[in-house]
Swiss-Prot record:
Active site: H118
Subcellular compartments: Cytoplasm; Cell projection, Lamellipodium; Cell projection, Ruffle; Nucleus
Enzyme Commission code: 2.7.4.6, 2.7.13.3
Region span, Interaction with AKAP13: 1-66
Name used for this protein in its record: Nucleoside diphosphate kinase B
Top-rank taxon, per record: Eukaryota
GO MF annotation terms: ATP binding; DNA binding; G-quadruplex DNA binding; GDP binding; identical protein binding; metal ion binding; nucleoside diphosphate kinase activity; protein histidine kinase activity
Cited CDD domains: NDPk_I
Biological source species: Bos taurus (Bovine)
Entry-linked InterPro entries: NDK-like_dom (IPR034907), NDK-like_dom_sf (IPR036850), Nucleoside_diP_kinase (IPR001564), Nucleoside_diP_kinase_AS (IPR023005)
């Protein structure tokens, strides 16, 4: 696929606990994106500190790491045309109060501290996050049968 890119999406502990994993995956699949990798894990503090290293000096950093370490997460890599930008639109605003209905956060969240999902904010950060959470051999290449019906 020409100009395909990848993004990192993580369903946070509150999204897992609330049983929203299937709904979130469904939305990305129905949009036409291809799942490249997925794992269900209890993220270590070390991994989370690396993931959120850009926020390490912010006052909410310790609470963010604690929250993300409080339960299992679903880490995923999705691929498709403009998947980073489109994925962010699908997620909604970081603050659910600013998210439109029809977005994941607009439909399922109330507070910014429990916003159920993370998505890469740029192609560069997606590459960094994918490399942090996944080994190269965990990224699976395949062509979905609907591929030719989604892309020109």
């Amino acid at each position: 696929m020409a100009h395909a890119e990848r993004t990192f999406i993580a369903i946070k502990p509150d999204g897992v606990q609330r049983g929203l994993v299937g709904e979130i995956i469904k939305r990305f699949e129905q949009k036409g994106f291809r799942l490249v990798a997925m794992k269900f894990l209890q993220a270590s503090e070390e991994l989370l500190k690396q993931h959120y290293i850009d926020l390490k000096d912010r006052p909410f950093f310790p609470g963010l790491v604690k929250y993300m370490n409080s339960g299992p997460v679903v880490a995923m890599v999705w691929e498709g045309l403009n998947v980073v930008k489109t994925g962010r639109v699908m997620l909604g605003e970081t603050n659910p109060a600013d998210s439109k209905p029809g977005t994941i956060r607009g439909d399922f969240c109330i507070q910014v501290g429990r916003n159920i999902i993370h998505g890469s904010d740029s192609v560069k950060s997606a590459e960094k996050e994918i490399n942090l959470w996944f080994k190269p051999e965990e990224l699976i290449e395949y062509k979905p049968c609907a591929f030719d019906w989604i892309y020109e």
